């Protein structure tokens, strides 16, 4: 039995299906043609961003298909001066969905590679927006969350490192060193807008999705706070020495990509594809100076933040990937053999949704 949606969510899903089938999928060829015009370094310039994506984003807003992922209402202080002229807000979704309801919309968006970004529901932005919405200060929300909610910028999440097994965040070696703590509150964030605490960030990250994008305005970076203690041992060292690894020093900070200490070393490829102009970068962080306003939630809260970010995001990724993969397989193998079987696609996609959940 297929999962039932409320009448409101069902109408939203039908509107989304029409948008994906009639606008996003036909635009994929135009998108690819534009990207094919660029080669080398110019693949990471603003000109390489296909105009089709901004056109689709504008259409999604007008259809009420914008920011569908949002799990909670947008704070009132962000909605000031955010009226589209018709009495509605451009950042808030047309309705707030449960995780199950949003999952069923993800399988619709997953049918087109353009639909998630067109609806402002693509990674890593969704996870970063959820973090800032749940844990960010008013300053962090106004400065970084608001442009993302409006679709004016992109972002990245920097966690994985080249020299360690980064699936265990206790292995991370990127260091956040506090150089002064004058005027710091109990939560470790500078008093009066973050003007007290000062930090220096050093390290190297890779597979940083979105960091190469010319629209990327900032990154959330997971780092270990330098407390003056020796670095935590690796898993192998832990076994040899018996010294336990710590888990309470990981901290998430906001780093502007325009900072002179931030350098995208190179784009990385997946099966030979660089995914320009979005991309997956190796990023060098050299003496990146930050103040207390860059710290999210406080020192040592990185695990808490990462769990709240990565949990729902993985489910959404599965929804997108299942249906995008099914569309490719059905086009190559299924429909040419059974050309009248397209009526079964919605049922099969629903079953994929159930399996993913």
Language model segments and positions:
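A short, Trp-centered hydrophobic/proline-enriched beta-strand micro-motif
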Residues: 151-160
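Glycine-rich phosphate/pyrophosphate-binding beta-alpha loops
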Residues: 165, 206-213, 311-317
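N-terminal glycine-rich flavin-associated loop
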Residues: 117-139, 168
């Amino acid at each position: 039995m297929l999962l039932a949606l409320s009448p409101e969510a069902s109408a939203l899903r039908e509107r989304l299906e029409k948008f994906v089938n009639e606008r996003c999928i036909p635009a994929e060829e135009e998108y690819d043609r534009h990207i094919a015009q660029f080669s080398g370094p110019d693949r990471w310039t603003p000109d390489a961003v296909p105009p089709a994506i901004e056109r689709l984003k504008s259409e999604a807003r007008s259809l009420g298909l914008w920011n569908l992922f949002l799990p909670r209402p947008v704070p009132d202080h962000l909605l000031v001066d955010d009226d589209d002229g018709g009495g509605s807000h451009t950042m808030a979704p047309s309705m707030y969905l449960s995780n199950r309801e949003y999952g069923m919309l993800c399988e619709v968006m997953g049918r087109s590679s353009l639909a998630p970004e067109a609806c402002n529901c693509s990674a890593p932005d969704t996870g970063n927006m959820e973090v800032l919405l749940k844990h960010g200060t008013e300053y962090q929300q106004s400065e970084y969350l608001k442009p993302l909610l409006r679709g004016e910028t992109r972002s990245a999440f920097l966690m994985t490192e080249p020299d360690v097994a980064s699936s265990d965040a206790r292995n991370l070696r990127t260091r956040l060193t506090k150089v002064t703590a004058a005027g710091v509150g109990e939560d470790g964030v500078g008093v009066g807008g973050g003007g007290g605490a000062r930090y220096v960030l050093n390290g190297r990250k890779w597979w940083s999705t979105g960091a190469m994008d010319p629209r990327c305005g900032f990154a959330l970076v997971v780092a270990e706070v330098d407390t003056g203690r020796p670095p935590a041992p690796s898993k192998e060292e832990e076994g040899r020495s018996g010294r336990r690894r710590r888990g309470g020093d990981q901290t998430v900070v906001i780093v502007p990509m325009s900072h002179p200490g931030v350098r995208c070393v190179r784009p990385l490829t997946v099966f030979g594809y660089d995914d320009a102009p979005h991309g997956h970068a190796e990023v060098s962080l050299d003496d990146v100076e930050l103040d207390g306003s860059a710290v999210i939630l406080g020192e040592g809260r990185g695990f808490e933040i990462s769990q709240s970010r990565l949990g729902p995001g993985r489910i959404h990724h599965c929804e997108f990937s299942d249906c995008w993969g099914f569309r490719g397989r059905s086009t190559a193998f299924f429909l040419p053999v059974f050309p009248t079987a397209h009526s079964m696609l919605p049922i099969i996609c629903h079953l994929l949704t159930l399996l993913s959940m």
